[in-house]
Amino acid sequence: MGLGVRAAPFTYVAHALAVAAATMVLVWCIHFRGGLAFEATNKNLIFNVHPVLMLIGYIILGSEAIMVYKVLPTWKHDTTKLIHLILHAIALVFGAVGIYCAFKFHNESGIANLYSLHSWLGIGTICLYGIQWIFGFVAFFFPRASPSVRKGVLPWHILFGLFVYILALATAELGFLEKLTFLQSSGLDKYGAEAFLVNFTALIVVLFGASVVVAAVSPARVEEPHEYAPIPES
């Protein structure tokens, strides 16, 4: 399935938005929220690691893994496949550490865990992400299924991957909303600089995710690599 447009312009837009989103979340957590720390008497610094790792390490790196076939269309397929696999693995590790930091913050601050939709979706999404990675490793890398099996499961692998990716984006949006709501209920100015920064960061993430999805389902060139197409056509 193609959209009649090439992927390249959307990968450029996605990369620009990724830089913007990463910069904005760092400004938020370091300038407005006081910095980052794995160990601190100020427990909020521990929490600050969570949005940074989840956005930059989990969503942005995961997005790069999704777009690698479009960003490097002339590279050997086995090379881009390995990059795809490694980037997803790194994103998964960063996501796990980011979730650990949220639990650590809650536990050390006496806050209950897993009570919100954001937390439920977060755990569910990273579990699905892990399952998707394991399936992709076994089917396409090692021990690697037969060509006919790979051809049959590839569309499902792509569709499920995009589903998990969109779910991760939705979870991030809920996270921004939840944290900003908590801050505003504690006295943060609803129309202040920090509130606007968080809201605009969330909007940038939506646009970024949309660019990644469009790039993923658009052809990189006239002829896609033999074994990989965004959504293989019948």
From Swiss-Prot:
Heme b 2 binds at residues 84, 157. Its cofactor is heme b. It is a multi-pass membrane protein. It is found in: Membrane. Its EC number is 1.-.-.-. Gene3D superfamilies: 1.20.120.1770. GO terms for molecular function: metal ion binding; oxidoreductase activity. Keywords: Electron transport, Heme, Iron, Membrane, Metal-binding, Oxidoreductase, Transmembrane, Transmembrane helix, Transport. GO terms for cellular component: membrane. Monodehydro-L-ascorbate radical binds at residues 114-123. Heme b 1 binds at residues 50, 118. Two-heme-containing cytochrome. Catalyzes ascorbate-dependent trans-membrane electron transfer by utilizing a concerted H(+)/e(-) transfer mechanism. The chain crosses the membrane at residues 10-30, 49-69, 83-103, 122-142, 152-172, 195-215. This is Probable ascorbate-specific transmembrane electron transporter 1. PROSITE patterns: CYTOCHROME_B561. Residues 13-217 form the Cytochrome b561 domain. Residues 31-48, 104-121, 173-194 are extracellular. It comes from Oryza sativa subsp. japonica. It comes from the Eukaryota. Its main location: membrane. L-ascorbate binds at residues 65-73. The lineage of its organism: Eukaryota, Viridiplantae, Streptophyta, Embryophyta, Tracheophyta. Binds 2 heme b groups non-covalently.
